A protein has these predicted regions:
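Conserved SAM-binding loop of SAM-dependent methyltransferases across substrates and taxa
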Residues: 66-81
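Conserved class I S-adenosyl-L-methionine
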Residues: 55-65
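S-adenosyl-L-methionine
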Residues: 83, 91-136
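Short glycine-dipeptide loop
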Residues: 80, 161-166
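Class I S-adenosyl-L-methionine
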Residues: 173-224
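A short glycine-rich, Lys/Arg-flanked "PGG" loop and its adjoining helix->strand segment in the class I
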Residues: 147-163
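Glycine-centered, small-residue-biased loops immediately flanking beta-strands
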Residues: 57, 84, 165
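Class I SAM-dependent methyltransferase Rossmann-like catalytic core
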Residues: 1-55
């Protein structure tokens, strides 16, 4: 096991984090491949198994900073060919990748929604969200805040997603997900929980993959 140098004076929690980072093969892989985040490998692993990223798609990436998912999407969807579209949005400034438009702002802002729609020039094939609330250290609170972001992402998907489209979003396992799973099951033909290998075993993080989007009015008719 590798141990970081100059541990003296650091808190025990910092020492544990540094040791874990040094011994994590996915952290090394992220650095070696020039990826902006470990999350890029998670997206890659999920797509390797479920094949939802296809050439020349129209995609929206919510909470796109620092841009790891953007890198994978651009490459796998071959957006450097000038066909398809990738719109990323985040509160933080994010460097663009080939075939992308990056917007800095809040998806709550109606003007931001209109700007996203103008770049898409139609409906999106996929809406992705790796959004997570800033942690407080109080797990129930952190869980509820992240579930709130998931609900926002679902509402956003209703605005831009094409019939038959795909939705992938970060979630946390816990007591509040049943109502949100209900929202997804009403809108999509299939909903799955995913846990990519690059997501740490001890983490409560999971992802929800929903495929076969039905517009809300169509979903209501299907239930009647």
């Amino acid at each position: 096991t590798k141990k970081p140098k100059k541990m003296r004076g650091r808190k025990l929690s910092s020492q544990r984090w540094l040791t874990r980072q040094l011994n994590d093969p996915f952290v090394s892989q992220t650095h070696d491949r020039g990826l902006r985040s470990r999350a890029a490998i998670k997206l890659e692993q999920m797509d390797d198994k479920h094949h939802f990223l296809k050439p020349h798609m129209k995609i929206v990436d919510l909470g796109c900073a620092p841009g790891g998912w953007l890198q994978i999407i651009s490459k796998r969807c071959r957006l450097d060919a000038g066909i398809g579209c990738l719109v990323g949005i985040d509160l933080l400034e994010t460097e663009a990748v080939a075939g992308s438009y990056i917007l800095q702002g809040d998806i709550h802002d109606p003007l931001m929604l209109e700007e996203i729609k103008s770049h898409l020039e139609g409906k999106a094939d996929i809406v992705l969200s790796d959004m997570a609330a800033a942690t407080t250290g109080h797990r129930p609170t952190d869980h509820l805040r992240t579930m709130g972001l998931l609900e926002i992402a679902i509402d956003f998907a209703d605005e831009v997603l094409a019939d038959g489209g795909v939705f992938l979003a970060k979630a946390f396992r816990g007591g509040a997900d049943k109502s949100l799973l209900g929202l997804l099951n009403e809108r999509f033909e299939k909903v799955k929980h995913l846990k990519p290998a690059a997501s740490r075993v001890e983490s409560v993080e999971t992802y929800l993959l929903a495929t076969g989007y039905l517009r809300v009015e169509k979903a209501e008719k299907a239930r009647d």
